[in-house]
């Protein structure tokens, strides 16, 4: 099987990002964005999705940083998936974290789209604006060219809600990116191909 990896560097007047991804990894994470909560959530994605992800990023403000990391990570997933032949393609996961429950369903169809039902009690998670959770997920799905439906079902602790959401995303992505041996070398679509 060909390696399903990607390495991307992105430099703009607002951000500098270096990222590497291995879809068939062991959950190794090395995150250095300068935003501790963001690093923590990205590490959940690697650990619970069994992806090896290394990200070194800095930016002129947190919005530009989160947006550009999402852009770069989405492009890396799209590149690593290649023609998407043999993948399971569609998956979902529901994950609890103490008081909170989050659900993610996705389709690695080659078409980026996001539907969110996220509620947070406050606008800030220890220096991380909660609206950036939504913005990260939407941007990641659009650039990664997959359909994403994400929902926080309930919870009383905003940190737990966000963490359950990232873990659910990781578990769903792990399943959807997995190779189905019954489908090896074949696109999982009646069209005979998926967009990439």
Curated annotation (Swiss-Prot):
Tell me the compartments it is located in.
Cytoplasm
- Primary localization class, coarse: cytoplasm
Give a GO molecular function annotation for the protein: imidazoleglycerol-phosphate dehydratase activity
Which Gene3D superfamilies does the UniProt entry name for this protein? Answer: Imidazole glycerol phosphate dehydratase, domain 1
Pfam families the record matches:
IGPD
Pathway(s) it belongs to: Amino-acid biosynthesis; L-histidine biosynthesis; L-histidine from 5-phospho-alpha-D-ribose 1-diphosphate: step 6/9
Q: Does the keyword Cytoplasm apply?
A: yes
SUPFAM superfamilies associated with the record: Ribosomal protein S5 domain 2-like (SSF54211)
Q: Which GO terms describe its cellular component?
A: cytoplasm
Q: Which reaction does it catalyse?
A: D-erythro-1-(imidazol-4-yl)glycerol 3-phosphate = 3-(imidazol-4-yl)-2-oxopropyl phosphate + H2O
For this UniProt record, give its keywords in alphabetical order, as a comma-separated list: Amino-acid biosynthesis, Cytoplasm, Histidine biosynthesis, Lyase
Q: What class of enzyme is it?
A: lyase
Quote the EC number.
Answer: 4.2.1.19
Keyword check for Transmembrane, yes or no: no
Gene Ontology terms describing biological process: L-histidine biosynthetic process
What HAMAP family does UniProt report for this protein, alphabetically?
Answer: HisB
NCBIfam families assigned: PRK00951.2-1 (NF002111), PRK00951.2-4 (NF002114), PRK00951.2-6 (NF002116)
What PANTHER family does this protein's entry cite? IMIDAZOLEGLYCEROL-PHOSPHATE DEHYDRATASE, IMIDAZOLEGLYCEROL-PHOSPHATE DEHYDRATASE HIS7
What family name appears in the similarity comment?
Belongs to the imidazoleglycerol-phosphate dehydratase family.
Q: Identify this protein by name.
A: Imidazoleglycerol-phosphate dehydratase
Q: What phylogenetic lineage does the species belong to?
A: Bacteria, Bacillati, Chloroflexota, Dehalococcoidia, Dehalococcoidales
């Amino acid at each position: 099987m060909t390696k399903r990896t990607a390495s991307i560097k992105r430099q703009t007047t607002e951000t500098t990002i270096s990222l590497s991804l291995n879809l068939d990894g062991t959950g190794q994470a090395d995150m250095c964005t300068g935003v501790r909560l963001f690093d923590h959530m990205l590490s959940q994605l690697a650990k619970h999705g069994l992806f090896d992800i290394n990200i070194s990023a800095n930016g002129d403000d947190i919005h530009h940083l989160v947006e550009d990391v999402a852009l770069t990570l989405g492009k890396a997933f799209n590149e690593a998936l290649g023609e998407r032949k043999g993948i399971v393609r569609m998956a979902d996961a529901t994950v609890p974290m103490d008081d909170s429950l989050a659900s993610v369903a996705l389709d690695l169809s080659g078409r980026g789209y996001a539907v969110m039902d996220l509620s947070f009690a406050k606008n800030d998670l220890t220096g991380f604006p909660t609206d950036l959770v939504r913005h990260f997920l939407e941007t990641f799905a659009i650039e990664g060219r997959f359909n994403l439906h994400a929902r926080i079902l309930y919870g009383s602790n905003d940190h737990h809600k966000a963490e359950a959401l990232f873990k659910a995303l990781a578990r769903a992505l792990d399943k959807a990116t997995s190779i189905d041996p019954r489908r090896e070398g074949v696109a999982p679509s009646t069209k005979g191909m998926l967009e990439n």
